[in-house]
Regions:
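Regulatory loop-to-helix N-cap segments in sensory/regulatory domains
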Residues: 162, 186, 192-205
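Signal-transducing coupling segments at domain and membrane junctions
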Residues: 95, 126, 136-141, 145-173
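GAF sensory/regulatory domain recognition
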Residues: 84-131, 157
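Signal-transmission linkers at sensory-effector interfaces
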Residues: 6-59, 64
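A short, aliphatic-rich beta-strand micro-motif
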Residues: 172-180
Length: 205
C-alpha cells in the first residue's frame, strides 16, 4: 500500500481517537458536574429544611403546625405529590395530624359525598385526621413499631397497600419514615407518588 495513504490513514485514525476521547472526556466532565450540582442542591435543600425546622422550634410553633411544615417540606424535597404524618399518642396508636396534597388513606374508605362547599382536599384531610391506626397495623404501624423505614417501589403489586377505586387516591409508590428524636418515636412520615410519574427508588430511600 502507498506509504502516504498509510500515513494519512494512521493520522486520521489517531485524530479520530483523539477527538473521540476528548468528546468522552467532556461528556464525563459534564455528567460529573451535573452530579455535583445535584448533590449541592440536595445539600442546600437539607440545610434549608433543618434551618426551617430549627426556626419553627425556636419560635415555639405549635406541634401541629410544625408537623404541617414537615409534611410540606417533605413533598418539596422528595418531589412527591402528597404526604401525611401520623403521630404516636400516649396509648401507642397512630393518629393522622398533618396532610399535604391528596394523600391516599391507609385504610379502605367508604365512599361518601362531599359536603356543600367542601373541597376534595379538605374532605380527605378530615378522613385522615380521624384515621387511627394501631401500633403494628399496616406499614405505618410496622414502621412505628420497628423504627425502620420502608420503601414501596410498586404499590400496585404490594398486598400491604390499600388499593382505592378512586384514581386520584391510587398509590403508585411510597416511602415510610419513622420520626425519631433522642431514641423516642414520635410517629411516621409517609410520602406518596412522585410527581414525575416514576417510582421512588433506593436513591430516594
Amino acid at each position: 500500500m502507498n506509504p502516504f495513504i498509510l500515513f494519512f490513514s494512521g493520522l486520521l485514525l489517531g485524530a479520530s481517537l483523539y477527538f473521540f476521547h476528548r468528546r468522552e472526556s467532556r461528556q464525563f466532565a459534564a455528567l460529573l458536574k451535573d452530579k455535583n450540582a445535584r448533590l449541592e442542591q440536595e445539600k442546600r435543600i437539607v440545610v434549608e429544611f433543618m434551618h426551617n425546622l430549627a426556626v419553627a422550634i425556636g419560635e415555639g410553633v405549635p406541634r401541629k403546625e410544625l408537623y404541617q411544615r414537615i409534611a410540606h417540606t417533605a413533598v418539596i424535597t422528595t418531589g412527591a405529590m402528597s404526604a401525611c404524618i401520623y403521630e404516636k399518642n400516649k396509648s401507642g396508636r397512630l393518629q393522622g395530624v398533618a396532610v399535604e396534597g391528596l394523600f391516599p388513606p391507609q385504610r379502605a374508605i367508604k365512599q361518601s359525598k362531599l359536603k356543600e362547599g367542601e373541597s376534595r382536599a379538605r374532605f380527605l384531610e378530615t378522613i385522615l385526621t380521624s384515621e387511627t391506626l394501631e401500633e403494628g397495623e399496616g406499614i405505618v404501624g410496622q414502621v412505628a413499631k420497628t423504627g425502620k423505614p420502608v420503601l414501596v417501589e410498586d404499590a400496585t403489586v404490594d398486598p400491604r397497600v390499600v388499593l382505592h377505586k378512586d384514581d386520584s387516591l391510587k398509590s403508585r409508590s411510597l416511602v415510610y419514615a419513622p420520626l425519631i428524636h433522642d431514641d423516642r418515636s414520635y410517629g411516621v412520615l409517609v410520602v406518596a407518588n412522585p410527581s414525575n410519574g416514576l417510582s421512588f427508588s433506593q436513591m430516594d430511600f
